Every structure is written in structure tokens, then in C-alpha cells.
Swiss-Prot record:
Family: Belongs to the ketol-acid reductoisomerase family.
Primary role: Involved in the biosynthesis of branched-chain amino acids (BCAA). Catalyzes an alkyl-migration followed by a ketol-acid reduction of (S)-2-acetolactate (S2AL) to yield (R)-2,3-dihydroxy-isovalerate. In the isomerase reaction, S2AL is rearranged via a Mg-dependent methyl migration to produce 3-hydroxy-3-methyl-2-ketobutyrate (HMKB). In the reductase reaction, this 2-ketoacid undergoes a metal-dependent reduction by NADPH to yield (R)-2,3-dihydroxy-isovalerate.
Gene designation: ilvC
Residues at which Mg(2+) 2 binds: D191, E227, E231
Comment on bound cofactor: Binds 2 magnesium ions per subunit.
Taxonomic lineage from the root: Archaea, Methanobacteriati, Methanobacteriota, Methanomada group, Methanococci
Name the UniProt record assigns to this protein: Ketol-acid reductoisomerase (NADP(+))
SUPFAM superfamilies to which the protein is assigned, alphabetical: 6-phosphogluconate dehydrogenase C-terminal domain-like, NAD(P)-binding Rossmann-fold domains
Keywords linked to the UniProt accession: Amino-acid biosynthesis, Branched-chain amino acid biosynthesis, Magnesium, Metal-binding, NADP, Oxidoreductase
Length: 330
């Protein structure tokens, strides 16, 4: 069983006298920095000078400085910029200031797990990862609650790395719901697998394939969109709130019978074999290498795929129907 920490299990002792530098001020950076500051922790923000994020962070009341200045002043450096830019920023602007006993922290284990960032041996390496978009991290904190999260320790140089990570998690508001202790490997590999096979890859391809099947059979694209895409939210919300069994209990008997008797013909043994192959590519580093080469080349394949997605009929039909439903503005 996993270890779960709650508010009662965690104190601020390991972080209350430390300076925490949040590097980056996107959705997660802003939410985590504000929550920790409002929890009484000493937070500074490291950014590129004079950009939109710089001005926003100042307006939010933070002490804002360059990444180099923040890395030098901080005891804990919490990196919340995109995965693909982290290695270059780390090497040039953070690594020179990683003196003995400091902690380098992440919200995703990708670059540490695959070795794109290799901190010196005399620092802690930790992870504090909210399992929610940044906007919800902030909103629920302001409401007096929070979202669930993860903590992990890749290296405990000072002997209190876990307490440091947990103190940050408490400051962000995660321990009010519960924080699961994991590892950099487990977080990285399960996160990538979920994105590729279900959340971003599998679901979107299933939607498109079903939409195309109906349109090719002569059904109106608008009807196809409603039945294969628009109504998905209703089912996902039920699963989110009640679990799979709760979803089955809240759909019609016809939908339940049809789903239970036909689903294995859609997700079959070939599908499961493909899932295992994708997981293996994640585990052995092939995906990470492929993605690294794609970045270095300037994202040619990704940009081509983006163009194809934008040109698909489902996008044109969906845009019009979302406008009709008041979900998308002109």
C-alpha cells in the first residue's frame, strides 16, 4: 500500500526558515508560489526579466528576480518551467548556484528520471506534484481545501529531504486532501503512459475514429459529433465523481448492456498489446530519446501533426456546435 500524508502528519519545520525559489510563473508556478506565500513560507520567483510573467508576479506581490539571482539566494529551487526547456535553463542559470545542501525540486520527474538533468551529488532532489491544473490548485486553496498531490525523493543528501518536500506540499495545500509518496520513476512512467494511451492519445483517436465511422456511413457530422465527442463529458464527469461502477449505475440499461457487451471488440487484445509496447518505449527511454530529437530538430513532426488535427472535419463541426451551445465565443 502507498504511504499517504495528511495535514496532521506534516509540519513546516523543515522549510519555515528556508527561501524557496519558484522558477516559472505559468499556471502551476503562479498557483504554487501564491499558495506557499499565503501559507507563510518565504517565496521568491525567478523569471526572465520584464516579460508578461515578470509583471504578473510583481502584481501578485512576489519578490521577483532573474533565475540566476533566485537560484543563488534560494535554499530550495522549485523548477516549474516546461519539461523541454528545463535542461538548458538548468545548465546555464541554475547549476552554477547549486551549492552543498540545497534542494532542487520539480513537479514532474521527467528530466531527472531520464538523465537530462544531473544535479551534483551534494544536493537533495525532490518532487512536489499537485494532481490538478494550476487554476484548481489555487481555487481550492482559497476555498480552504486543496487538491491531492505526490511527493518523491530521488536523493536525500541532508537527511530531511522528505520533510522538505512535505513542508512544501503542506504550503501548497495538498496535505489537506492527501499526499501520496511515490518515486521519480513511477510518477514519470505512469504519467506518460496515461497521457499517451488514455488521456491525450487513446481518447482522442477513439473519438475521431468513431466520428469518421458515422460520417462515412452517411450520418450528419453534427449528429456524429454530439454522439462521439460532446456527450463524453457527461460520462467522464460520472466516472470522476462516482467511479466506473457508479457510471454504469447512472446510465440507461440499454447503454449499460451495449457498452458491456461491445467494449471488448473496440479495446481488444491487439489494443492491449499496443499498450504494452507503448509502456515499454516509456520504460526503456525510447520515447524520451525520440522526444528529445524532435525538440532539437525544431518540432517538425509535431507541427505537421498539429496542422492535420486542425484541418480535421471534427474541428470545423465541433467549433460551430460549441458556439451554438454557448461553449465557445465567436
Amino acid at each position: 500500500m502507498v504511504k499517504i500524508f495528511y495535514d496532521k502528519d506534516v509540519t513546516f519545520d523543515a522549510v519555515k526558515d528556508k527561501t524557496i525559489a519558484v522558477i516559472g510563473y505559468g499556471s502551476q508556478g503562479r498557483a504554487q508560489a501564491l499558495n506557499m506565500k499565503d501559507s507563510g513560507l518565504n517565496v521568491i520567483v525567478g523569471l526572465r526579466p520584464n516579460g508578461a510573467s515578470w509583471n504578473k508576479a510583481i502584481k501578485d506581490g512576489h519578490k521577483v528576480m532573474t533565475i540566476e539571482e533566485a537560484a543563488e539566494k534560494a535554499d530550495i529551487i522549485h523548477i516549474l518551467i516546461p519539461d523541454e526547456v528545463q535542461p538548458a535553463v538548468y545548465k546555464k542559470q541554475i547549476e552554477p548556484y547549486l551549492t552543498e545542501g540545497k534542494t532542487i525540486s520539480f513537479s514532474h520527474g521527467y528530466n531527472i528520471h531520464y538523465g537530462f538533468i544531473r544535479p551534483p551529488e551534494n544536493v537533495n532532489i525532490t518532487m512536489v506534484a499537485p494532481k490538478s491544473p494550476g487554476a484548481m490548485v489555487r481555487k481550492t486553496y482559497e476555498e480552504g481545501f486543496g487538491v491531492p498531490g505526490l511527493v518523491a525523493v530521488e536523493r536525500d543528501y541532508t537527511g530531511d529531504a522528505l520533510q522538505i518536500a512535505l513542508g512544501m506540499a503542506k504550503g501548497i495545500g495538498l496535505t489537506k486532501v492527501g499526499v501520496i509518496q511515490t518515486t521519480f520513476r513511477e510518477e514519470t512512467e505512469t504519467d506518460l503512459f496515461g497521457e499517451q494511451v488514455v488521456l491525450c492519445g487513446g481518447v482522442t483517436e477513439l473519438i475521431k475514429a468513431a466520428f469518421e465511422t458515422l460520417v462515412e456511413a452517411g450520418y450528419a457530422p453534427e449528429m456524429a459529433y454530439f454522439e462521439t465527442c460532446h456527450e463524453l463529458k457527461l460520462i467522464v464527469d460520472l466516472i470522476y465523481q462516482k467511479g466506473l461502477q457508479g457510471m454504469w449505475e447512472n446510465v440507461s440499461n440499454t447503454a449499460e448492456y451495449g457498452g458491456l457487451t461491445r467494449r471488448a471488440r473496440v479495446i481488444n487484445e491487439e489494443s492491449r498489446k499496443a499498450m504494452k509496447e507503448i509502456l515499454k518505449e516509456i520504460q526503456d527511454g525510447r520515447f524520451a530519446k525520440e522526444w528529445s530529437l524532435e525538440r532539437e530538430a525544431g518540432f517538425p513532426h509535431l507541427n505537421a501533426l498539429r496542422r492535420l488535427e486542425k484541418e480535421h472535419l471534427i474541428e470545423k463541426v465541433g467549433k460551430e456546435l460549441r458556439k451554438m451551445c454557448g461553449l465557445e465565443k465567436e
